[in-house]
From Swiss-Prot:
<keyword id="KW-0066">ATP synthesis</keyword>
<dbReference type="Pfam" id="PF02823">
    <property type="entry name" value="ATP-synt_DE_N"/>
</dbReference>
<dbReference type="InterPro" id="IPR001469">
    <property type="entry name" value="ATP_synth_F1_dsu/esu"/>
</dbReference>
<keyword id="KW-0793">Thylakoid</keyword>
<protein>
    <recommendedName>
        <fullName>ATP synthase epsilon chain, chloroplastic</fullName>
    </recommendedName>
</protein>
<keyword id="KW-0375">Hydrogen ion transport</keyword>
<dbReference type="GO" id="GO:0005524">
    <property type="term" value="F:ATP binding"/>
</dbReference>
<dbReference type="InterPro" id="IPR020546">
    <property type="entry name" value="ATP_synth_F1_dsu/esu_N"/>
</dbReference>
<dbReference type="InterPro" id="IPR036771">
    <property type="entry name" value="ATPsynth_dsu/esu_N"/>
</dbReference>
<comment type="similarity">
    <text>Belongs to the ATPase epsilon chain family.</text>
</comment>
<keyword id="KW-0150">Chloroplast</keyword>
<comment type="function">
    <text>Produces ATP from ADP in the presence of a proton gradient across the membrane.</text>
</comment>
<keyword id="KW-0934">Plastid</keyword>
<keyword id="KW-0406">Ion transport</keyword>
<dbReference type="InterPro" id="IPR020547">
    <property type="entry name" value="ATP_synth_F1_esu_C"/>
</dbReference>
<dbReference type="Pfam" id="PF00401">
    <property type="entry name" value="ATP-synt_DE"/>
</dbReference>
<keyword id="KW-0472">Membrane</keyword>
């Protein structure tokens, strides 16, 4: 049995396929979703989504949004998303390093909040590309 997974950003459908298992980062922690999951509506945090298709795993960096599960249909609405296979490792590492440096040097509440969001986004992209390159699915 499978789940139908659909990931939508404001300007495009990012992903539309069947999957056996999905792991999401929600605002209250990670959740695993299998076929016949109870209906659920949850907010998503900035983080990595892992998708199992047959025996292979692939990843995607999600930049926050919402997920709705009902009748083996998982619909994810995100602000932005990027497949791990589409991310350049070196560029993601550089962006992460710069974001970490900006966070460490941030002064004031607004600058700290903005730097923290940039750091979380960079971290999600880096984790997605690293997890994707270590999996068999590309």
């Amino acid at each position: 049995m499978t789940l139908n997974l659909r990931v939508m950003a404001p300007n495009r459908i990012v992903w539309n396929s069947e999957a056996q298992e999905i792991i999401l980062s929600t605002n209250s922690g990670q959740i695993g979703i299998l076929p016949n999951h109870a209906p659920l509506l949850t907010a998503l945090d900035i983080g990595v989504m892992k998708v199992r298709i047959n025996s292979d795993w692939c990843t995607m960096a999600l930049m926050g949004g919402f997920a709705m599960i009902e009748n083996n249909q998982l619909t994810i609405l995100v602000n932005e998303a990027e497949k791990g296979s589409d991310i350049n490792l070196e560029e993601a590492q550089q962006t992460f390093d710069l974001a970490q440096e900006s966070l460490n040097q941030a002064t004031g509440k607004k600058q700290t909040i903005e730097a923290n969001l940039a750091f979380q986004r960079a971290k999600a992209r880096l984790e997605a590309v690293k997890a994707n390159s270590s999996s068999a699915y590309n």
